[in-house]
Amino acid sequence: MAFKYALVADSLVWVGYNIFENTDEVLRAVKEAGYDGIDLPGSPSTMDGAEWKKRVADSGLVSPEVLGAWGYGHAGEVRNLASKEDDVRNYAVQYAKDCVDLAADAGASMVEVCAAQPAVPELPFPKDPIGLLRDRFRMSLKEICAHAKEKGINIVMEPLNSYEGFPGVLTTIYEAKMYIDDLGLDNLGIQPDVFHMNLEEGSIPDALRAVAPHIWHFHLNETNHYSHGMGHADYKAIFRILKGIHYDGFLANYCPLTTQEILAGATGDVYGTAGEERSGGDRSQRPDLVEALSTMVQFQKNIEKAVDLSRERYEADERRY
């Protein structure tokens, strides 16, 4: 079965665009480039879910997920699901519940959560005991999943690397599985991300095999954040594993980092910049959107074809002997 491909809307700023500006034009470009879906930003205070559901459907796409904005640099505020402070944790839980409501209204089936570092990262270990942070994060998951269950929404955990997420709380695929095993919730799954796995997992293929039934969404994000193929991600190995475990969810592509000037030219409220003036932007340097998006997804589809062909030949050889 062929993979389904989505675009992570938040990452459009890396190539100088913004989903909140000329939304319909951007959605049409995503469809024209060859994608099946688009992951929506986790901005429940500014988005009308019903309106976005119609816009996405009119463009011929679907929205698999609402991607939460958790890191301080992305959110512009503290959203800490593992905090020992009740008011801080409750605030983050409420944000997640609001994202669930947005997903339900927008026709998405999943919401992403993670255990992001605070504004000042705590390295190499958190200030508070890891066991305490895990307990608090576990409490948050229970509350969020209960609300999501009422709305028919699944929650997917995205393990972050230790520079962006609390070390020892949710930085590996295995830690994500620990929460699934502990809580036993049928609407809690995992969203692996190639960039983060590259930093944290001893073996990406082994990690994916270990949690195969729990992978419900997947982020394709090159190991250096640049164009797919310019890092050292072994996409063939990853795709072979996903084909082998019969993964039937979406592969969500991140746009690549380009230049500081192009990022600065992405207008609007992105990455915690609400109300801020950004200088140095040059929108004339932006790549053509359809071309940029189609280059990414075609790269992935070509690898998928190669993997499918090798699997077919291997199966044919097995039958021959």
Name the predicted role of every residue range.
Residues 14, 40, 80, 125, ...:
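Conserved short-loop catalytic and cofactor-binding motifs
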Residues 1-16, 20-31, 170-192, 196-321:
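Histidine-acidic metal/acid-base catalytic patches
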Residues 58, 82-189, 283, 287-290, ...:
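Active-site acidic/histidine proton-transfer and metal-coordination neighborhood
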Residues 1-15, 69-82, 115-125:
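N-terminal small/glycine-rich loop or linker at the start of catalytic domains
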Residues 39, 65, 112, 156, ...:
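Conserved beta-strand positions in the central sheet of alpha/beta enzyme cores
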Residues 11-13, 42-44, 69-72, 115-119, ...:
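Active-site-proximal loop/turn and secondary-structure-junction residues that shape catalytic pockets
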Residues 2, 25-32, 46-71, 101-107, ...:
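Acidic (Asp/Glu)-rich catalytic clusters
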Residues 48, 121, 165, 228, ...:
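Glycine/Thr-rich phosphate-binding loops of Rossmann-like dinucleotide-binding domains
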